[in-house]
Each structure stands twice: as structure tokens, then as C-alpha cells.
Amino acid sequence: MTSNALLCFCSSQQLYADCCEPFHLKTKQPQTPEQLMRARYSAYAVKNAVFVRDSYAKEKQAENSISEIKDFATICCFVNLTVLDSGYDEDTGFVKFKAHYFYQDLYCELAEHSKFIKEDEQWRYLDGEITPVADIKVKRNDTCPCGSNKKYKKCHSV
């Protein structure tokens, strides 16, 4: 299936080709912190570690290696993104979100209030405050927590 027919991984209900893919291909730049947050989430889902690393603030790029980002993206299955709030002014912005993913047999939620800055006329992720959320251990015959109403073994089981 080509990206032209896929819904975007960022849960925007738009086609990937019209939503985050142009950012990943660098044919467009995110105009808001929320667009960048969605593009980062989708980049993890498609294992585009270079985009994720390049979207960090310059001061944070060295501590976030492409290989570590790729390793994390490869062992996880990203399920959905919920943006709760976002805003920005000329040079700073924020996005409050919940990202859901599977890591092995755990259903995980990353709840974060992310901070963004503008560098060289581009939005970049600076850092964020993470709200701890307990992971859920999922058994093969449990209903998948992604909301599909299928058994986990028939849905997201690796």
C-alpha cells in the first residue's frame, strides 16, 4: 500500500501523503509546534530516525543519536497520538499530548508537555515534562487496548 492511501500515523484523520509525509521528505516545513509534534510521532511510526534527530533543538541533537532513535522506533509499535492542547508565540511553543505504543507485551502511554523553540526559522523540539503513567501488561487473549475490539494476538501482538 502506498503512502497515498494511508491515513497519517499522527491520528489527524488526514492522508499521510497530505499530512506528515511532506515534512519527512522536507518538501514542507511544520508551521506550528503541533505540526512538528505530529510529524515527530509519525516519524517514529515509520522509523525515520533522521527526521526525529533533526527536529530536536540543535543543543539536544548530539545526545539523541540516530541509531538509538532507530532502535527505539524499531522495537515499538505506535498506535495513536492525542493532542490535548498546544500554543505558540513568535519563538516558543508547547504541545501537551499522549502517545500510545506497544513495547513488547506492554501497552505504554507517554504523557508529555513538550517545549518547542524556533531556530533558523524552523520549529524544533527542546524538551518536555513527562507525566508518569503505568504501562499495561497485555496477554494474548486480552482485548487489545488500541480500541479495535480484537484480541491482542490478532491485532498488535508481535
PLM features: what roles do these ranges have?
Residues 54-83:
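Short solvent-exposed beta->alpha transition segments
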Residues 29-62:
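Internal alpha/beta loop-helix hairpins
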Residues 1-39:
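Short, low-complexity N-terminal intrinsically disordered segments enriched in polar/charged residues
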Residues 4-14, 138-149:
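Short Cys/His-rich zinc-binding micro-motifs
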Residues 111-137:
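Short beta-strand edge/turn micro-motifs at domain boundaries
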Residues 18-20, 153-156:
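Cysteine-centered loop/knuckle micro-motif
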Residues 73-109:
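Surface-exposed, charged secondary-structure patches
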Residues 94-96, 107, 123-127, 142:
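Long C-terminal interaction/binding lobes of large macromolecular proteins
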